[in-house]
A protein has these predicted regions:
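Bacterial N-terminal signal peptides that target proteins for export
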Residues: 2-14
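Bacterial N-terminal signal peptides
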Residues: 12-23
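Secretory-pathway extracellular proteins and peptide precursors enriched for disulfide-bonded cysteines
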Residues: 15-16, 101, 186
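Extracytoplasmic thiol/disulfide redox context detector
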Residues: 24-141, 200, 208-217, 222, ...
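Cysteine-centric redox/oxidoreductase cores and disulfide-bonded domains
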Residues: 139-250
């Protein structure tokens, strides 16, 4: 005879989750918790005789957590719309509009290179309606030059040449290296000594990390990723789609 029927699912779930949570505890205080032997035996028996209920309960729990994460993500996206000053921060901007188009990008990402063209075309068409904000999101696990390139672009920003440097990096994406960063800086007539100091400074590191942490807090995992007027977009979004979003923007 089963210890519990399916009708007793809430109690069953409590027992199962109690065992799972306590058995997975890692802190010293939690490690000292000892389960009553009979209670543990009951829970294990429940799991053995009612695996379908356990799986169903875990699936329901995962769905609840996903919904919570999605809601938190949506709230984060909306903050770009409700608090534009905070969204911009110290990031470089392009265009003078009130509708914010926040881009998370990686200079070594080929899809970001395609997105760059679409975004420039779009903002150039609607400069009084849209403002593009660039956020660094170097995918360092797969792009070895993404972080050095981001720091070089940040250094160029300190001399008012971010977008020119940004465009040059994407134009030379296949040959990104230290020599390239210096050559672009010379072409743009930057103060080379200052440029080199800035790109290797703690301030550059902190600025890039701040953008990365912001992206991670929003659940962003890849690039290019955009938030236009509080709504997420991913990939090299076509100009036509951006215009469609602009038409419906409030």
């Amino acid at each position: 005879m089963k210890l519990f029927s399916l009708a007793s699912q809430p109690f069953l779930v409590t027992l199962c989750l109690s065992l799972l949570l306590i058995s997975c505890a890692q802190t010293p205080v939690q490690a000292e918790v000892k389960l009553d032997a009979q209670f543990e035996k009951q829970v294990l028996e429940v799991i053995r005789k009612n695996p379908e209920v356990v799986l169903e309960s875990l699936r329901a729990y995962q769905q609840q957590e996903q919904l919570k994460a999605q809601q938190a993500q949506k709230t984060g996206f909306q903050k770009f719309k409700t608090d534009p000053k905070a969204a911009i921060g110290q990031s470089p901007t392009y265009g003078n509009g009130k509708l914010l188009l926040v881009e998370f990008s990686d200079f070594q990402c080929p899809y970001c290179a395609s997105a760059r063209i679409n975004l420039k075309t779009f903002v150039d068409r609607y400069p009084d309606r849209v403002k593009l904000i660039y956020k660094h999101f170097p995918l360092t696990q797969i792009h070895s030059e993404a972080l050095p390139a981001a720091k070089a672009a940040w250094a160029a920003q300190q001399q008012g040449k971010f977008w020119d440097y940004h465009n040059a990096l994407f134009d030379q994406q296949k040959t990104l290296n230290d020599e390239t960063y210096g050559a672009i800086a010379k072409t743009l007539n930057l103060d080379i000594a200052k440029f080199n100091r800035d790109r290797t400074s703690p301030q550059a590191t902190r600025a890039i990390e701040a953008d990365q942490k912001l992206g991670e807090s929003l659940g962003i995992e890849g690039t290019p990723f955009m938030v236009f007027n509080g709504e997420p977009l991913s990939g090299a979004v076509p100009v036509a789609e951006l215009e469609k979003r602009l038409t419906s923007a409030k």
